[in-house]
Every structure is written in C-alpha cells, then in structure tokens.
C-alpha cells in the first residue's frame, strides 16, 4: 500500500504549494548547482567547497526571518560567523597555489545564499504532509523544468559518443543517483526531523571532505594557510552553534534559580 501511495502522482492542492515546490526546484537545483559548478571553473575545488560551507550561516538568518526558528540570534552566533569569514578570507587570498579568483569566490558565496532559501523551503514543504519521495519528485520536476532554458545560454552539445566511455557513464550515474536523488531525499527527511538550521550544521563537514578529496582525486596542493583557514571556518561555525547552546543552558539555569 505504501509503495502504491508513493508511486502515485502528487495531486494539485493549491498554487501556494506549487509555488513552494517551484521555488525549491529553482533554488535547490539550477541556481545552486549552476553557480557552484561555474565557480569551479574559476576556483579550485577545495576553495569552492570551503566557501560554500558558510551556507549554515545564511540558513540561520533566513530561517530566523521566514520561519522564526531558534529564537533570536545571539551576539555569540555572529562572533563565530566573523571567525569563519576570517578563515574563508585566508583561504581565498592564500597565495598562488590557490589561484585567487574573485569571480569564483563570489559565485560560491552566492551558491551558499541560494541554498539557504532551499533549506527554508524544504522545511515549508515538509509541513505539507506529503512523503519525502513525493516532495523530492515534485522538486526535481520543477528543477529540471528550470534547468532546460539554461542549456541555451551555455555551450551545450549532444555527444552520444561520450556515453560509450565507462568513466563518463559512472560520473552521470553517481551525480544523478548518489549526489542528487539520494542526497535530496535524505536532506528533505533530515530537515523534516531536525529543522532547517540543525540540518545545515552538517554542511560544516563539507570543506574537510572536499579538501581531502581534492588532494586525493584532483592532486591539488593545500597550503598551510589553507589548512589554517579550514580550521578557522569549522571552528568559527561550530563555536557559534555551541555558544548558542550554552546561552540556552544558562538561560534555563537562570530560570530554575528564579523559581527556587
């Protein structure tokens, strides 16, 4: 019965819901991936990966504005953000081996901002009461719909010969199933359970994984300044989250003392 329900098409209920799905499809797929992938043509993978990791900061601010989550953002949160931005700056301006390119860095920051809107829309979609599979399918529908016009603005050519290459087929399979379908399903499920801000916290691990992968797969060189920048980014973002928790704990203890 559950399989029949999830395989059935999602019914139309209201234009408000459809606009939410469309907004998620636009921000989560074409805008985010185009900005990130174009950034990769200007900057190194490790550089882009670290800068995009500031998405949780934008998500917290966006969620505060549109979802009223987590209450008021405390000063400690912004202190952590400043530390993270210092780390990002060190990575972006760390010398010749990182191939400084402001265009790539700006596009990476833009991708992080776009993702924050997708995270908030994911939370709104989760409140519609549909299954995660239904939500992901409808989001993908609009994402592909918005992606088609982009083909006319880029040098896109059909080359069926490429599909005879095992590496090419593997890359498409990995990006389509692993990095897209599975990731979007698990992301939407996590947002439904944890919320937009808490789920975005796990993006903190992205620069570490990206930096390691760029060394192993792409043979990129990571300088000492880059390593320092990564530490500051992760430390600053984690500090802002921990400080928020400490603030809530202190507030709770203060309330208990007043009651006593």
What name fits each language-model region?
Residues 62, 73-94, 204, 225-244:
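Hydrophobic transmembrane alpha-helices of multi-pass small-molecule transport proteins
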Residues 33-37, 57-60, 92, 115-120, ...:
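Residues that mark transmembrane-helix kinks and helix-interface sites
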Residues 29, 45-54, 121-144, 176-216:
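Helix-helix packing/entry segments at the starts of transmembrane helices
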Residues 3-52, 83-84, 90, 176-194:
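Specific transmembrane alpha-helical segments of multi-pass solute transporters/efflux pumps
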Residues 1-13, 65, 85-99, 142-166, ...:
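Membrane-interface helix-cap regions at the ends of transmembrane helices
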Residues 1-2, 23, 58, 77-86, ...:
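Hydrophobic alpha-helical transmembrane segments of multi-pass integral membrane proteins
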Residues 244-260:
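Intrinsic disorder in cytosolic terminal tails and internal cytosolic loops
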Residues 55-79, 208-227:
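C-terminal transmembrane-helix exit sites in multi-pass transporters
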């Amino acid at each position: 019965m559950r399989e029949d329900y999830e395989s059935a098409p999602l019914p139309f209920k209201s234009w408000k819901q459809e606009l939410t799905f469309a907004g998620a499809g636009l921000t989560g797929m074409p805008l985010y991936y185009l900005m990130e992938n174009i950034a990769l043509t200007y900057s190194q993978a490790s550089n882009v990966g670290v800068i995009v990791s500031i998405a949780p900061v934008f998500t917290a601010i966006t969620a505060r504005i549109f979802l009223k989550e987590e209450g008021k953002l405390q000063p400690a949160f912004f202190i952590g953000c400043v530390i993270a931005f210092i780390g990002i700056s060190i990575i972006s301006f760390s010398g010749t081996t990182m191939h400084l390119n402001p265009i790539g860095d700006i596009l990476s920051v833009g991708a992080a901002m776009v993702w924050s809107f997708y995270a908030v829309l994911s939370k709104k979609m989760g409140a519609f009461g549909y299954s995660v599979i239904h939500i992901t399918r409808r989001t993908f529908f609009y994402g592909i719909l918005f992606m088609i016009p982009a083909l006319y603005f880029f040098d896109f050519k059909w080359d069926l010969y490429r599909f005879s290459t095992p590496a090419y087929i593997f890359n498409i399979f990995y990006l389509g199933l692993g990095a897209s379908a599975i990731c979007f399903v698990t992301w939407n499920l996590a947002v439904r359970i944890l919320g937009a801000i808490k789920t975005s916290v796990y993006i903190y691990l992205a620069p570490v994984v990206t930096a390691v992968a760029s060394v192993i797969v792409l043979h990129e060189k990571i300088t000492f300044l880059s390593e320092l920048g990564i530490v500051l980014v992760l430390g600053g973002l984690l500090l802002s989250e921990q400080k928020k928790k400490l603030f809530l704990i202190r507030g709770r203890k203060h309330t208990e003392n007043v009651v006593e």
